[in-house]
């Protein structure tokens, strides 16, 4: 049979086995089912269709055996081709977006410029309107001020025409000649008053200038008086030396010159120093007018109070000569004024001026005024002023002042630390070391507490236990019961534990026992050996407390150490008759 004949013979389709046929039908059904489940037609999203056919391709590869490697290679190329298409689409989408952005930039720039022009025009309109409104407001203010001035000028002195004219009867007020004569009298009186104002009176500003000048002159006078006293004292000493030298020269100069000086000095003392001073001061012109000046100063102060010039009055009183107005009476004057709405408290103004000028006087502000000033500042919520007064000015502190600041700190918790620091300064200045150290404890400054205790060594055990009652802190107790620089402890640990449990501070005591329990028996033994204040009976009480609160090991350690100490007997060096081996032979 030729080749041509073979090619002309009809080619039969391959015979498909039953299993392959069922597999192909199942794949066809799977494709139809998944496509319908997506709800899209044939032109739907390519990604979903790609997933469906990829799954079918995988199942076909799993089903066949002879062509599995070929189909796997085809599928790999197919997946790579699909991924390349997706990547190209994403790149095209990004480039399309950038292209649209670049195309829209000129338009956006035009819109922004247009919007800028619109906003600038709107700002100019608003500024013009604002300037018009401001000019209208200024005009209204000017018109109102002019109206008020006119009202004061014309309405204040207006009188009811129906009322009778003072100094004229009803018939005279109806007579034109009498009215003309009375008007002439009033005009003459007005001219006289106006002339008197020009001659007899000066402006109030001139009065204040004179007051300031007088204050400066009074200060200069005080300086001159101090210098004058020093010169008088020097003159008196030179006079004594001169008289002694004259007497010594007239004598035979056998006696020492020092004896003549002492004799002349005793003679002067018998005559009286006050008489010498008065003799030397009798020509002082300021002494005669001192009482008059002080009286004028007090009158001026009262005048300022009556005029309501409380700030000037406060400065005037604070700078008064010889401190005549720096007293409780002046304080009561300001206190009687009370509060004025919209203005500072006059009493606070007085204390401000009083404390600020405290350095200008030899003596500091007394304790009573200091206490009242601190109370006034705290009542007005001016802790800043009180801080400045206490730290910068010359005041006389007292225990009451520190207590007032502490009480204020308890009410104002935000400023409690500042108040405790101020109170500690005051207590330290007054020598109230117990209260000063309590303030340090409340601030949590344990190291400063220990430094304070070492500096002032007059703290007894009762004082320290009282401190623990007021401020039970674990860190403080540990520092007090610890040796510092090989020195004896400030407080007994055992006494501290017993004291805490006796004053219902059980929690603090338990925490201390927990801390000491962590150190083991060596720490307990070291603590007991170095504790010379607590007796054996006291340590037995501590052991009982430990046992009652669940610290059995610590209790046993304490009792063991007590037994070991009881077995040791100290032999003095003087007792030579003691035989250490005596018990062996008996």
Curated annotation (Swiss-Prot):
Parts of the chain that traverse the membrane: none
Coiled coil: 174-232
Statement: the UniProt record of this protein carries the keyword Coiled coil: yes
Keyword Ribonucleoprotein: no
Pfam families: Clathrin_H_link, TSNAXIP1_N
UniProt keywords, alphabetically: Coiled coil
Disulfide bonds: none
InterPro entries: ARM-type_fold (IPR016024), Clathrin_H-chain_linker (IPR012331), CLHC1 (IPR017212), TSNAXIP1_N (IPR032755)
PANTHER family: CLATHRIN HEAVY CHAIN LINKER DOMAIN-CONTAINING PROTEIN 1, CLATHRIN HEAVY CHAIN RELATED
Protein name (Swiss-Prot/TrEMBL): Clathrin heavy chain linker domain-containing protein 1
């Amino acid at each position: 049979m030729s080749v041509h004949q073979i090619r002309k013979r009809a080619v039969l389709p391959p015979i498909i086995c039953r299993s392959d046929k069922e597999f192909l039908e199942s794949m066809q059904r799977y494709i139809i089912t998944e496509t319908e489940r997506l709800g899209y037609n044939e032109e739907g999203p390519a990604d979903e269709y790609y997933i469906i056919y990829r799954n079918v391709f995988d199942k076909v590869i799993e089903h066949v055996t002879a062509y599995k490697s070929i189909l796997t290679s085809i599928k790999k190329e197919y997946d790579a081709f699909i991924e390349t298409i997706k990547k190209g689409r994403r790149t095209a989408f990004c480039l399309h977006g950038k292209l649209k952005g670049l195309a829209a930039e000129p338009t956006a720039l035009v819109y922004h410029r247009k919007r800028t022009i619109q906003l600038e025009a709107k700002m100019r309109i608003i500024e013009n309107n604002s300037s018009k409104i401001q000019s209208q407001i200024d005009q209204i203010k000017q018109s109102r001020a002019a109206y008020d001035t006119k009202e004061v000028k014309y309405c204040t002195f207006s009188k009811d025409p129906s009322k009778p004219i003072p100094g004229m009867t009803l018939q005279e007020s109806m007579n034109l000649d009498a009215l003309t004569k009375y008007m002439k009298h009033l005009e003459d009186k007005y001219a006289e008053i106006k002339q008197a104002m020009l001659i007899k009176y000066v402006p109030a500003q001139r009065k204040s200038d004179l007051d300031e000048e007088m204050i400066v002159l009074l200060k200069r006078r005080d300086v001159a008086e101090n210098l004058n006293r020093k010169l008088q004292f020097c003159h008196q000493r030179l006079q004594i030396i001169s008289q002694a030298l004259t007497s010594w020269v007239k004598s035979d100069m056998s006696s020492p010159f020092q004896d003549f000086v002492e004799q002349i000095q005793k003679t002067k003392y018998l005559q009286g120093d006050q008489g010498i001073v008065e003799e030397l001061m009798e020509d002082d012109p300021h002494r005669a007018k001192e009482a008059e000046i002080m009286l004028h100063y007090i009158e001026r102060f009262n005048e300022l109070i009556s005029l309501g010039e409380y700030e000037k009055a406060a400065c005037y009183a604070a700078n008064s000569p010889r401190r005549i107005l720096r007293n409780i009476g002046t304080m009561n004057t300001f206190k009687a004024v009370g509060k004025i709405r919209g203005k500072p408290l006059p009493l606070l103004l007085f204390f401000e001026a009083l404390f600020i000028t405290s350095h200008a006087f030899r003596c500091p502000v007394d304790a009573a005024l200091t206490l009242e000033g601190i109370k006034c500042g705290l009542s007005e919520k001016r802790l800043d002023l009180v801080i400045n007064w206490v730290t910068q000015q010359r005041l006389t502190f007292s225990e009451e002042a520190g207590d007032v600041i502490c009480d204020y700190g308890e009410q104002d918790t935000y400023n409690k630390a500042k108040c405790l620091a101020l109170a500690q300064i005051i207590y330290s200045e007054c020598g109230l070391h117990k209260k000063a150290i309590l303030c340090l404890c409340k601030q949590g400054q344990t190291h400063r507490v220990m430094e304070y205790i070492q500096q002032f060594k007059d703290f007894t055990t009762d004082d320290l236990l009282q401190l623990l009652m007021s401020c039970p802190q674990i860190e403080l107790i540990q520092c007090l019961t610890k040796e510092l620089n090989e020195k004896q402890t400030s407080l007994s640990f055992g006494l501290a534990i017993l004291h805490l449990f006796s004053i219902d501070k059980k929690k603090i005591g338990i925490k201390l026992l927990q801390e000491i329990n962590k150190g083991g028996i060596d720490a307990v033994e070291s603590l007991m050996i170095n504790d010379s204040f607590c007796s054996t009976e006291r340590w037995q009480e501590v052991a009982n407390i430990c046992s009652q609160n669940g610290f059995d090991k610590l209790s046993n350690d304490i009792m063991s150490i007590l037994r070991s100490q009881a077995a040791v007997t100290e032999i003095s060096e003087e007792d030579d008759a003691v035989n250490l081996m005596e018990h062996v032979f008996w």
